[in-house]
Amino acid sequence: MSSFESDSASDAESAFSDASSDFTPSSSVKSKGKVPLRDSTNTTAQPSAPATGDASDQYQKLSQLEHILKRPDTYIGSVEKTGVEMWSFDAATESMIYKEVHIVPGLYKIFDEILVNAADNKIRDPSMRNIKVNIDAENNTISVMNDGKGIPIEIHKKEKIYIPELIFGNLLTSSNYDDDEKKVTGGRNGYGAKLCNIFSTEFVLETADLNTSQVYKQTWTNNMANLTKPKITKLKSKKEYTKVTFKPDLSKFHMEMLDDDILSVLRRRVYDLCGTVKDCNIYLNDKKLSIRNFKSYVEMYVNAIRERSPDPVAPEGETRNYSTIVHEVFNDRWEVAFAVSDGSFNQVSFVNSIATTSGGTHVKYVSDQIITKLIDALTKKEKGKKKLNIKPQEVRNNMFVFINCLIENPAFTSQTKEQLTTRVAQFGGKPSEKIVISDQFIAKILKTSIADKIRTIVNANEDKEMSKADGSRKSRIKNQVKLVDANKAGTKEGYKCTLILTEGDSAMPLAVAGLTVVGRDYYGCFPLRGKLLNVREASIEQVSKNAEINSIKQIMGLQHKKRYTPENIKSLRYGHIMIMTDQDQDGSHIKGLIINFLETSFPGLLEIPGFLLEFITPIVKVTITGRGNHRVIPFYNMPEFEKWRETEGTTCKWKHKYFKGLGTSLESEGREYFAALDRHMKSFHALQDGDSQYIDMAFSKKKADERKDWLQAFRPGTHLDPQIREIPISEFINKELILFSMADNVRSIPSILDGFKPGQRKVLYGCFKRNLRSEIKVAQLVGYISEHTGYHHGEGSLAQTIVGLAQNFVGANNLNLLQPIGLFGSRAAGGKDFSAVRYIHTNITDLTRVIFNPLDDDLYTYVQDDAQTVEPEAYLPIIPMLLVNGAEGIGTGWSTNIPSFNPVDIVANIRRMMNGEEPVDMTPWFKGWEGDLERISPEKYKVSGKIEQVDDDTVEITEIPIKTWTNSVKEFLLAGLGNDKPWIKDMEEQHGINIRFVVRLSKEEMDKSLRMGLLERFKLISSISLSNMVAFDPQGRIKKYSSANEILKDYYWARLELYQRRKDMMAENFQNQLTRLSEQARFIKLIIEKKLTIANKKRSEMVDDLKKLKFTRFNKNGKPVHDEPLVEAEELAEEEEEAAGDISQLNLGLVAPEDESQYKPETTYSQYDYLLGMAIWSLTRERYEKLLRQRDEKQEELNELLKKSAKDLWNSDLDDFLVGWEEFLRADIEARNSFGPTAKTSTRKRARKSTKSEPAQKKTKSSTPKASTPTIKAEATPAQPVVKEETNKQPDLLSFFSKEPSVAKTVSAAPPKRKTPKSKPKKEIVSLFSDSSDDDITSFSVGDAKPTPKPSTNNILDELEDLKSSTFTPKVGAAGRRRPKSYALAESDGNESDEDYMSE
């Protein structure tokens, strides 16, 4: 007990033995000129003078000893018996018990002071092993003895008395007054043991000092008023000790004896030492206590709690270890244990062995950490919730915290030391000695019942919060302005009423119009604003603040957590809900969300038959227009309409109208619908077994894997039976809601064929349809695409899609299909920093039409949207753009993340597959990126930037991980430069062509960074995963691919099949031209030989003659007509003029009629126009001979085509692509190396240049493609040069015949072009269906037209050279790549307007 409570003046040693001889101090111990303290008289022992009543008698001066005895509560607490609930030790059961005891706090405190002194000695002398406490209640005697160093037995140099007497018999003496010395003992103010002495009738001190080999013993009596001379004897053993024995002055505490209550508390305090003093044996009444450490000490409390509150049952599927103590020794100074309390916060804490029964800053600091981390951990488990709806105090009330800590120079609220006041920052210790609650500690706590208790509290709070928005059955609701309330709602007949929930405000007029039919007594309407919240995993905050849900609850009168049955449904304002949404996928989703809301919050409602209804309206109305068969057929879903169109729709004439939304219908139609309410109203079947599981699968975030299986099992054509009157919820989910989920995935997941999502596909289709050749404002292009491609979403999203297709900074597209003419975003912000779309321009790039070959356009299947033909279901470019540019997206149940790869590697693998070889593994590649890729697993790559140390205190960052943007790195560096503990001295940005951050560090931080690794310290490492490559396969099914080569293989076979179809189409077109030329030659020959006369004949007579001569008929698409029945001209006489106007507006190539069934068949007349439309001057023998030569040439071209395989055609396209790719890379390098004000100008020049094509006969093999489409050479023999279009036209064969529309006229049918300067050469017209009756009949070359590439300038270009020279033996030119008739276009000179040739 080393001079108790730090009261010793020096470290000395003691021993467990009595002195063998007496020792009498000499008179020299008395100081000169000063009376020793032991000889002074305590003034408290003298009687005070009686008061005389004057002012002097009213004001007294007391000595400190007198003050302590008169005002003991200031020093030791109350000296009156006080009833208080606290932990005590039950000697009978030998266990802790929490009960109300009546004790005198002052008596407890003086005992505690002696006990703490004994514990403090363990800090001074770690070799101390024993503390022995004896409590003799009968004799009112308490003794505390400890081994270890004793009190120095020597004379104090200044006070001239023995040090033991100084520190135990004189106030304000201590060794703790040096505040510069950091101590973790309990003594602090110099009172301690003296207070015990003062409040004792007898106080005996005994200590042994090994240094002097003496034993010191001294006795004080009469409240420290009297003392004996010290008895000093010789120490016989070599063990030091200190022992204090005292008899409390029970009269001062108004007690007669030590009763059971105070004894139980004193015994508990002795047990406290078992837990707080490490490696020390604790004895009580000569019995060694079995508690060995803090954890076993805590178990005594937990066992007591368990006896009062048995363990609850753990939730199913979870493990709860309620009885185990969560205990951790964090460091030498902090030891913490946790248990679950029984409803109120409990703490048992010790500071330097002092029992802080009222807690303090140390308890708050630890418990606050536990509470915060508990809430955070439970919040993470409750996905979708920002924070649990619980207050920290509510968590605290369920905690029992045990703390044993050492704090330097602790401060308390008073001398009683019940509450620590030391600030956290002054706890002291090294950083490693601070207390930080670990995640492992929290994880263990979560396995106790605290988690369940917190959830119970959260649920109660949420219920309380949700109840605030509860409705009630009242006749009028005043705060819902948009509600059209039923007159009977909220009355005793309210259960008969039906609330119609419409999809948005636009549908309200239709519903309100219907109320004029059914009346307003039992029907009300309310518009839903957008889609209802998915409440399944939503936080209570989200649900309680959701306006739509609160409105429904108020309007319906729903009360939170009330279980509704057919018996109590009369308590609602409405007895039914009827959903009235659009008949599209989004409408189905809204229905599903309402079902999900009811099943989650009010499941009883769905169990009531007829509660939930839906109102259906037609999505398509078909009007049969045939004579005597005029009728209207409504269709309520698209699969049903598509099936009808392919069957019955082919047998009659009809027209149709799409109803994309309820707002499309007229109010009169609304009244018509409600008049036939039974036909348009369907009910949902009451909840059946398994329905809840389907709802959970469709809407729970936890069921993502199940949704994947559900969507993979989908088959096109799936739809809900329109005849069913009562819809099972499972049927609705599996046959209607699934259509929305599939549509969501289609919007979010790309196709393997073209790598596009629908929005991107629409953009490209719109550019092709517009025949985009010169730059156009993005804002203008947005409007055009929105109008012509059936885009039904916001134009802002469409603009972002266009910008995304044009972005070419590092980390964006490897191959941008649109030109970024302007500021389209940068690597700094990941492209989000693009300029307003009204300022930036775009155009298709040179390579776009090389990759998306026009010859394929007629081979695609095009989507029908609202009676309009729009983009193809999927393009099939000559290389897989999904691998070239990669893709990311999040759909329903599925997401995708596909990195980009090098087009050179892709082409090489395609050619390997052409040669029957297996493709080799490809590594992700990003144009312009110079970082490092390292494969760390089959499905993962490590992505590293570049950083190097340039001198002792400087590093340079010259590359960052791909998809990490410059601004993010800058933010990280600035945070290191300016936070509370900056580790960066300075940072500069010196970006030029490439990234360059220059960062300066201190020597210490540089050393630390080098130890950690520069890449790691500066967070220049990320990863690329190949484990989530999802796309729609060629059959339109969602598929997860395991590798890039698996994607390539699926693409390869689809593309190869399309090449075969292209070849077949080209061969068929060549054959048709041969037939056409032959028939024209035969026609001219008959005219010349006068075997056929056309002059002075009626039109019908001429057609009859041609029929008899069996001339082949050709339809408007240039194909021969063989089997179609002829329509007699007489029957079509009236219809022909009307049809001519409509048919002339049809697109003759890509775009089909809006609805083919609305148009009349072709007439026989038009099918002979290729003969009767020939100019008169063509009827000559020269023309006849020329046609025969052209026929032979065409036959030769056909023979050349038939010699080639599909692979030959593909390889030829790949050759052209590689040449264009080389030029593309050169231009990209030049653009990135360009600086100054001329950069933008040069970009625009290139854009204009790309729209100008040289005449075909002037091109050489060394030239590279400049046009946005592959050039198709129109070659002619020397003897027969290509004839230009004549400006002076000859008279027509018959005055009422019009010359057959040439391809040039097809192009010019659109709005007139701006005039071209005369100096510009005329552009040749190239057509696969060249059918002009004059000399302008074009032949096609099948020779090798592969241009020679320019010399390579870098490694990428060298790879291109190697690839072109070493793979795939056959070398086939660009011969078969000809435009179909629909793409027969005059070359642009750059000044022409963009013509919409697809709409002509």
Curated annotation (Swiss-Prot):
What segments bear the compositional bias annotation Acidic residues?
Answer: 1389-1400
Q: Which CDD domains match?
A: HATPase_TopII-like (cd16930), TOP4c (cd00187), TopoIIA_Trans_ScTopoIIA (cd03481), TOPRIM_TopoIIA (cd03365)
Biased composition, class Low complexity, residue ranges: 1-30, 1262-1271
Record domain Topo IIA-type catalytic: where: 749-1214
Provide one Gene Ontology biological process annotation.
replication fork progression beyond termination site
- Give start-end positions of Basic residues composition bias: 1312-1321
Cofactor names: Mg(2+); Mn(2+); Ca(2+)
Q: Does the keyword DNA-binding apply?
A: yes
A single Pfam family it belongs to is DNA_topoisoIV
Instruction: Indicate the segments forming the Toprim domain, all copies.
Output: 497-613
InterPro entries per the UniProt record, alphabetical: DNA_Topoisomerase_II, HATPase_C_sf, Ribosomal_Su5_D2-typ_SF, Ribsml_uS5_D2-typ_fold_subgr, Topo_IIA, Topo_IIA-like_dom_sf, Topo_IIA_A/C_ab, Topo_IIA_A_a_sf
What are the residue positions of the site described as Interaction with DNA? 531, 534, 707-708, 757, 791, 797, 965
Checking SMART domains in the record gives:
HATPase_c (SM00387), TOP2c (SM00433), TOP4c (SM00434)
GO molecular function list = ATP binding; DNA binding; DNA topoisomerase type II (double strand cut, ATP-hydrolyzing) activity; identical protein binding; metal ion binding
Summarize subunit and interaction data from the UniProt record for this chain: Homodimer.
Q: What does this protein do?
A: Control of topological states of DNA by transient breakage and subsequent rejoining of DNA strands. Topoisomerase II makes double-strand breaks.
Name of this protein = DNA topoisomerase 2
Gene name of this polypeptide: TOP2
